Amino acid sequence: MQIVFMGTPDFAVGALEALIAQGHEITAVVTQPDKAKGRSGQLQFPPVKECAVKHGIPVFQPRRIKTPEAIEELKKYPADVYIVAAFGQILSQEILDLPKYGCLNIHASLLPKYRGASPIQRVIIDGETQTGVTIMQMNAGLDTGDMLYQKKISIASEDTFETLHDKLMVLGGEAITEALPLLEAGKLTPEKQDDAKTCYAALITKEMGRLDFTKTAAELDRLIRGLTPWPSAYTFYRGKQLKIWKAIPMATAHREAPGTILAVNKDSFEVAASEGALKVMELQLEGKKRMTAHDFLLGVKVQPGEILGE
């Protein structure tokens, strides 16, 4: 099939590479404009653009995809279907109607659950045991189109946003390459989403990362994993921000106030939660590098009874 591919971050690269490998003709890649990075302000290609350039595919980077000029540019690229994966701009109905098969979106959740911008983080934070990707026929709403195809995956107890993202990136490529032949053969049956079963995965913010030790150890562990590597979970220790990169929820019984350091071991320390405790394994004190708790404890004399969060 002739395809115009729309996407921007790493998540979309898996699908683009899979479509190229399957032999589809990618007539153009549409992605966000290059962004300045670091103190130098040097412009950096979006990951999808890097992939397109590597394969010699034309790249179109409109600041606003809805303008008449952008739409006229899109019309220059022949396409049976537009494939969209984390593009970052909302498409107008005029664009949705351009290709023969419309626009298909690769969404990183099992719709109708977790519509919105942050489904991967949210499924971990909420304690889901299963997620996946949905191939959806796009309409003018936000992730509200008819579902065409789904692939599921289990969420491991140690999965972080980073590891689950990478699994779903691969799964998205598998799903779209399995769905397209069925679409062309007329074997996909659109299924309307049940709005009663939906929930919205709102944008993740840095403020969400502050650990509230009045929650259970299991809840805190899920928050840490869901926000690793960005924006990261954190607390305060001796007046400085302390990022917690890895911890293990423990069923430790105690009577201490939430946030109290219960025990200090050679390679970890335990912090009281409302139920159970967090065994901190990897962390980063403000102004320092990320390190194991073992290395941290070699330089900092952490004492039982101290309180995190102050």
What are these regions (language model features)?
Residues M1-S40:
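N-terminal Rossmann-like dinucleotide-binding module
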Residues M1-V4, A79-Y82, G209:
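Short active-site oxyanion
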Residues A36-D80:
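N-terminal glycine-/serine-/threonine-rich beta1-alpha1-beta2 phosphate-ribose binding loop
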Residues E25, P58, Q130, Q241:
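Residue-level detector of anion-binding/catalytic polar loops
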Residues Q2-V4, T27-A28, P58-Y77, I90-A108:
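Internal alpha/beta domain cores that form substrate/cofactor-binding pockets in large enzymes
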Residues Q22, Q32, V81-Y200, T205-E207:
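Donor/substrate-binding cores of folate-linked one-carbon enzymes
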Residues F213-E310:
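An anion-binding loop in the catalytic cleft
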Residues V13, E17-A21, E72-K75, Q93, ...:
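Amphipathic, non-transmembrane alpha-helical secondary structure
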